[in-house]
A protein has these predicted regions:
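Ankyrin repeat A-helix N-terminal signature
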Residues: 72-77, 106-112, 139-145, 173-179, ...
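C-terminal motif of bacterial Sec signal peptides marking the signal peptidase cleavage site
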Residues: 22-24
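Leucine-rich solenoid repeat scaffolds
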Residues: 232-262
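Bacterial signal peptide processing site
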Residues: 26-28
Length: 263
């Protein structure tokens, strides 16, 4: 009877313990489920949008061109490739080759007008010189690249303190080589020094007379220089003026123009 009483006392305690255990078992799956849900959220694959962004980023990296690629494209006259490089995230527009020639100078050398304009619009330096002291601006003036010169004068700022290897500006060789249209462009622009003297003391006027043949084109160049105020009394390192050369070489028409200018 005593044992029966003890069992009656212990029974509620056992039932209570069983209830606690059962309650714990019922809540356990909920905790596991929550944990699984959290893990699943963390390892979900990237969205389509993020994949697209990643692909774009990789494409940008691939479009970064190596040093020398712009020079190569310009040297080959490849307009589309040049444009593609200029539209890329990173490039060196004034990179140089072993002769210190920039892409722009090479384009001017080759008279590649569309590529030259493309490079100028992208900010290429028209004053940077190579190992023989040619610059895009000086070369365009000296070698009759009239359309290129006109574009430079309209869209950039030539540095008039940068001279060629003979100490001359763009006007002197333009006059000496018979590029009348370049002479007109430079004089109309008014930024070039009309009476600048190079290492030999030559001005554009002296070279147009003393170093050439006195033909019609040089008569027109002399007239253009005089019309724009060229000083005909300046002397070169040998002490001679443009009129001295005209008389010495028998250029009658030019001599007459110079005498009229001096009177």
């Amino acid at each position: 009877m005593k044992n029966f009483k003890l069992n009656l006392v212990a029974l509620p305690i056992a039932l209570l313990s069983f209830s606690v255990v059962l309650s714990a078992c019922q809540t356990e799956p909920k905790q596991v489920k929550t944990s699984q849900s959290s893990t699943q959220e963390k390892i979900q694959p990237p969205s389509t949008e993020s994949t697209k962004e990643s692909t774009k980023s990789e494409e940008k990296v691939q479009m970064t061109f190596t040093t020398g690629s712009l020079i190569q494209a310009v040297s080959e006259g490849d307009f589309d490739q040049t444009k593609e490089i200029l539209n890329s995230p990173a490039y060196l527009i004034d990179e140089v080759n072993e002769k210190s020639e920039t892409p722009l100078l090479i384009a001017v050398y080759q008279n590649q007008i569309p590529i030259t304009k493309l490079l100028i619009d992208a900010g290429a330096n028209i004053n940077q010189q190579d190992v023989i002291q040619d610059s895009p601006y000086l070369y365009a003036g000296a070698q009759g690249r009239t359309e290129i010169l006109a574009y430079m004068l309209a869209h950039t700022t030539p540095d008039q303190s940068v001279y060629n290897r003979f100490g001359g500006n763009a006007l002197i060789p333009a006059a000496e080589k018979g590029h009348l249209e370049n002479v007109k462009l430079l004089l109309a622009d008014k930024r070039v020094a009309i009476d600048h003297q190079n290492k030999f003391g030559y001005t554009a006027l002296i070279e147009a007379v003393g170093l050439r043949d006195g033909s019609q084109i040089y008569q027109e160049i002399v007239a253009e220089l005089l019309r724009n105020g060229a000083n005909s009394s300046l002397r070169d390192n040998s002490g001679r003026t443009a009129l001295d050369y005209a008389n010495q070489l028998g250029y009658g028409n030019i001599a007459q123009m110079l005498r009229t200018a001096n009177s």
